[in-house]
Each structure stands twice: as structure tokens, then as C-alpha cells.
């Protein structure tokens, strides 16, 4: 039986740039650095960075694949401004109904998509039940 997510690992082209991003911008706690690796605790998760300089990264922006972190509604403006102030690549995101809460989509220095979201799974399911009758829901 799966218990939980153990860790998330990102391939990065420049370890120092990524350490700066995850520590100084996203406020992750740096736990370990090595020649080509760094570990963080971020939002209760183990985030691992492994430097791999020769990995193609040009098509990653076409995918909707991303990792979302929860933030409070009251912190939305703070985080949006923090990302802007640090010249983070903020993405336009999708058009969203306010019942689906607020999100900020952005990328790390290697183009990995991240999201800061103010909603919960329960919020999303309730919104979809109300607004999307074509969907099938299971218990």
C-alpha cells in the first residue's frame, strides 16, 4: 500500500541557481548540499535537486504538468508580489472561475511548472459538482 509521497526530485541545470530559488524565493529549508545535489524541506515535503547539465529542457513549457503548493487566501498578494520582486517567470495561467479559488503559476530556473493555490480538493470537488454536470463523481 502506498503511504505518501516520499520525495520530489527535479533535474536542474545549475545547482546554485536552483538553491537560490528554492531557499531564498520559496523559503524552503536547505538540509544538504553536495557536488551535484541539494535537499530541501518545503511545505512538509522532501525536495531533491540533482544537477544534470546536458538534459534538453526546451519543450517543458508545453506541458500542464506541475506541482501545486497550498497557500492561504490572505497570502495570495504577498506571494504574487514576492515572485514578481524576484523576477520569477510568472505564467498567465488558465481562465478560472472564482469558485475554483486563486492560483499563481510560475516556473523555477529550469522551467519546472509550480503553482501556489488557495483552494483544497474539497473546494474543487464542490465547485465541479455545482458547475460541471457532465462530470462523474465517485464515493
From Swiss-Prot:
Keyword line: Antibiotic resistance, Cytoplasm, Magnesium, Metal-binding, Transferase
GO biological process annotation, one example: response to antibiotic
Subcellular location: Cytoplasm
Domain VOC residue range list: 4-119
Enzyme's top EC category: transferase
Keyword DNA-binding: no
Presence of the UniProt keyword Magnesium in the record: yes
Disulfide bonds: none
Top-level taxon of origin: Bacteria
UniProt: Mg(2+) binding residues: 7, 66, 115
A single cellular component GO annotation: cytoplasm
One Pfam family per UniProt: Glyoxalase
Active site: 115
Cofactor: Mg(2+)
Residues forming coiled coils: none
NCBIfam families: Fos_BSH (NF000493), PRK04101.1 (NF003152)
Assembly with partners or alone: Homodimer.
General function of this protein: Metallothiol transferase which confers resistance to fosfomycin by catalyzing the addition of a thiol cofactor to fosfomycin. L-cysteine is probably the physiological thiol donor.
Entry protein name: Metallothiol transferase FosB
Source species: Staphylococcus aureus (strain N315)
Record lineage: Bacteria, Bacillati, Bacillota, Bacilli, Bacillales
Gene: fosB
